[in-house]
């Protein structure tokens, strides 16, 4: 059950990260504070996506809290690295994100996935 909550947390946090990235690229920069505030108060699509991203992070924290009650911290914390993989893949697949593929990034993803496999593979008891 803890693994399920952890995966929910990772998926929701990844979607929230993508939402915040979209909002940040479409809203005025915070260096133009009054324009930024005006865009938030207009509550257009960009502001709503920003709010969804923030609410997504809040929901992700709730799922993470549930994860930590059911799963060892050493395993739970390793799950967070899945978010890097999901966001990288989504940035290449989703239109408008212009994520780039590189062998270096693929090697990083392979390292992350290998590490997760090592952590989550069942251990066998050795007999002496």
Curated annotation (Swiss-Prot):
Heterodimer of ArnE and ArnF. Pathway: Bacterial outer membrane biogenesis; lipopolysaccharide biosynthesis. It is found in: Cell inner membrane. Residues 1-2, 57-76, 122-128 are cytoplasmic. This is Probable 4-amino-4-deoxy-L-arabinose-phosphoundecaprenol flippase subunit ArnF. It comes from Escherichia coli O127:H6 (strain E2348/69 / EPEC). GO terms for molecular function: carbohydrate derivative transmembrane transporter activity. One of its GO terms (biological process) is lipid A biosynthetic process. Its main location: membrane. Keywords: Cell inner membrane, Cell membrane, Lipid A biosynthesis, Lipid biosynthesis, Lipid metabolism, Lipopolysaccharide biosynthesis, Membrane, Transmembrane, Transmembrane helix, Transport. Belongs to the ArnF family. It comes from the Bacteria. It is a multi-pass membrane protein. InterPro entries: Flippase_ArnF, Small_drug/metabolite_transptr. The chain crosses the membrane at residues 3-23, 36-56, 77-97, 101-121. Translocates 4-amino-4-deoxy-L-arabinose-phosphoundecaprenol (alpha-L-Ara4N-phosphoundecaprenol) from the cytoplasmic to the periplasmic side of the inner membrane. Residues 24-35, 98-100 are periplasmic. GO terms for cellular component: plasma membrane.
């Amino acid at each position: 059950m803890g693994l399920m909550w952890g995966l929910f947390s990772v998926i929701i946090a990844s979607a929230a990260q993508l939402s915040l990235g979209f909002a940040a690229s479409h809203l005025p920069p915070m260096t133009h504070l009054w324009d930024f505030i005006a865009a938030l108060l207009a509550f257009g699509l960009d502001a709503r996506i920003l709010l969804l991203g923030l609410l997504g992070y809040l929901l992700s924290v709730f799922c993470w809290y549930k994860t930590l009650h059911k799963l060892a911290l050493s395993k739970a914390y390793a799950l967070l690295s899945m978010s890097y993989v999901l966001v990288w893949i989504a940035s290449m697949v989703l239109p408008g994100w212009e994520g780039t593929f590189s062998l270096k990034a693929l090697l990083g993803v392979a390292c992350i996935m290998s590490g997760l496999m090592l952590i989550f593979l069942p251990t066998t008891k050795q007999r002496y």
